[in-house]
Amino acid sequence: MDRFVSTYTMRLDAKGRVSIPAPFRTVLAKDGADGLYCHPSLAEPALDAGGNRLVGEIDALIESYPPYSEAREELAAALYGTSETLRIDPEGRVVLSDTLKAHAAITDQVAFVGLGHKFRIWEPERLKAHLAEATQRVRELRQAIGSRAENPRSTKA
């Protein structure tokens, strides 16, 4: 299965277009996506983006809640209601709307970060800060896991 991997920093051109990294375009093409599905991240000051696989995962998440339930309505509004399908031009560029750019504080550069089934679009300095925090949390998690592996709980009765 093809995945979005690696990080790429790209510059917006004078018309506000940005090129999707070629490896990401390849994954989108294999996914059969005819555009780029993009919405403000629910967790970060960034944008979540992807193709049909991402849309399918969102559909499954929303459909896991009972019809007309409050949770389903809120998820649908948060994910479908704020999403945009961006047209990819023949050169592999998209135009981010002002709403999307405002959510992620994007001005002249963006960083594309592969997350496997989707990718995230960040303002590069915000990404740098996020990665520093995430790396620290992963180190702490690794230490906690290592401590448990070294000192397994006793199984004696």
Curated annotation (Swiss-Prot):
Gene3D superfamilies: Transcriptional regulator MraZ domain (3.40.1550.20). InterPro entries: MraZ, MraZ_C, MraZ_dom, MraZ_N, MraZ_sf, SpoVT-AbrB_dom, SpoVT-AbrB_sf. It holds the Pfam family MraZ. Its main location: cytoplasm. One of its GO terms (molecular function) is DNA-binding transcription factor activity. CDD domains: MraZ_C, MraZ_N. PROSITE patterns: SPOVT_ABRB. It is found in: Cytoplasm, Nucleoid. The keyword Repeat applies. GO terms for cellular component: cytoplasm; nucleoid. Keywords: Cytoplasm, DNA-binding, Repeat, Transcription, Transcription regulation. The keyword Repeat applies. One of its GO terms (biological process) is negative regulation of DNA-templated transcription initiation. Residues 7-52, 83-126 form the SpoVT-AbrB domain. Forms oligomers. Belongs to the MraZ family. This is Transcriptional regulator MraZ.
